[in-house]
């Protein structure tokens, strides 16, 4: 697993200059094995509007050879939008999505639970304030294992 993390870091360093050049934002990089096949998944977004297939294709073309030099075995490269239930990876993501419903997974239990459906209320330094059961709960960013925007069909 440590080796996978190192590869993700190297892929991130490869991708970042192209992301900046294309005026996009990197959401996440995954290097995973699924069903016997290896995948490099790069999730990007356009902060100035909708991400289109041309952006994904263009980035894929720019980085493909460099990523192939890094990984010795066969893999599939996927470049896409993070989707409706995008992950929140950086502290800035929480600021950007204040007021949104999310699924929150903590590293340690809080009230005998690690998983919550909550709303981002505020970001205060390295702490995020969530609205849980009509109460404000402050949690340090480094106590969050993972979080995703919560898409509920009935919101429409």
Curated annotation (Swiss-Prot):
Keywords assigned:
Cytoplasm, Ribosome biogenesis
UniProt protein name: Ribosome maturation factor RimP
Name the SUPFAM superfamilies for this protein. YhbC-like, C-terminal domain, YhbC-like, N-terminal domain
> Got a GO cellular component term for this one?
cytosol
Annotated organism of origin:
Fusobacterium nucleatum subsp. nucleatum (strain ATCC 25586 / DSM 15643 / BCRC 10681 / CIP 101130 / JCM 8532 / KCTC 2640 / LMG 13131 / VPI 4355)
Keyword Signal tagged? no
Task: Sum up the protein's function in the record's words.
Answer: Required for maturation of 30S ribosomal subunits.
- An individual GO BP term: translation
Write down a Pfam family by its short name: DUF150_C
């Amino acid at each position: 697993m440590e080796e996978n993390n190192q590869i993700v870091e190297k892929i991130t360093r490869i991708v970042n200059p192209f992301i900046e050049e294309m005026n996009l934002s990197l959401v996440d990089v995954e290097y995973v094995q699924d069903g016997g096949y290896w995948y490099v998944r790069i999730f990007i977004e356009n902060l100035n509007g909708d991400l289109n297939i041309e952006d994904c294709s263009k980035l894929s073309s720019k980085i493909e050879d460099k990523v192939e030099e890094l990984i010795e075995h066969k893999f599939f490269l996927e470049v896409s939008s993070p989707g409706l239930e995008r992950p929140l990876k950086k502290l800035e993501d929480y600021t950007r999505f204040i007021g949104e419903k999310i699924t929150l997974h903590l590293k340690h239990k809080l009230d005998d639970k690690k998983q919550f459906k909550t709303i981002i209320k505020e970001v205060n330094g390295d702490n995020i304030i969530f609205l849980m059961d009509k109460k404000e709960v402050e949690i340090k960013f480094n106590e969050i294992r993972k979080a995703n925007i919560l898409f509920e069909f009935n919101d429409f």
